[in-house]
A protein has these predicted regions:
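Generic secretory/membrane-interface signal
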Residues: 41, 77-80, 151-153
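Alpha-helix C-capping/helix-to-loop hinge sites
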Residues: 26-31, 49, 148-152
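Short hydrophobic/aromatic patches at helix-to-coil boundaries
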Residues: 167-170
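Phospho-regulated, low-complexity intrinsically disordered regions of nuclear gene-regulatory
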Residues: 2-30, 53, 57-144, 162-164
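Flexible coil/turn residues that form the inter-helical turn or adjacent wing/linker of helix-turn-helix
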Residues: 35
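Short linear motifs in low-complexity, proline-biased tails and propeptides
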Residues: 152-163
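DNA-recognition alpha helix
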Residues: 23-27, 38-52
Length: 170
């Protein structure tokens, strides 16, 4: 984060997948109104974060394929991102669908394996996913419809209604 530490310090031991996750998490945290980001936005955020002297060649392919839960693994099998539309990604959340071959795959960096100053992102992610699940439940159209037809059955029990419909059937 550029905000997390000195730009003079180049960190070389962070995995490419973790670097992609960090950049995407930062985008989500900085732009809470955005549901997803373009591949280019994530690449640019990786560049801006400058965890390495140069952009590593694997960053793009991790964003496009290796980290994407709902794509077939080829060969990377992380579940760190979700493809929301062509060319669009967001962080993976528990409950998102994923390719069966990615079962059990890594979804977040281990806090001990990311650069100092970024550990708070893992805690932020835990809160973000919890809130996202709550929002999904609160905004689910089927769950919102619960009880909406109650007034239709105030005069007649459902079993009586079915019996009445079946009258005259042979």
């Amino acid at each position: 984060m550029s905000s997390a530490g000195s730009k003079n310090l180049t960190i070389t031991n962070v995995r490419v997948a973790d670097e992609v996750w960090i950049a995407t998490a930062l985008l989500h945290r900085e732009h809470p109104e955005a549901t997803d980001f373009s591949i280019e936005e994530i690449v640019e955020r990786v560049k801006r974060e400058a965890l390495h002297n140069t952009l590593r060649p694997g960053v793009y392919v991790h964003i496009v394929s290796h980290c994407v839960a709902n794509r077939p693994p080829n060969p990377g099998r992380y579940r760190m991102l979700v493809e929301t539309a062509e060319g669009r990604r967001r962080l993976y959340r528990p409950g998102d669908s994923y390719h069966p071959s990615r079962e059990g795959a890594k979804t977040t960096p281990n806090a001990s394996e990311i650069p100092p100053g970024y550990g708070s992102l893992v805690h932020w992610y835990d809160e973000w996913t919890k809130n996202a699940v709550d929002d999904v439940i609160k905004n689910d159209p089927l769950l919102k419809a619960q009880g909406s037809g109650k007034h239709l059955w105030t005069d007649e029990h459902a079993d009586e209604y079915v019996r009445r419909l079946r009258e005259g059937w042979e």
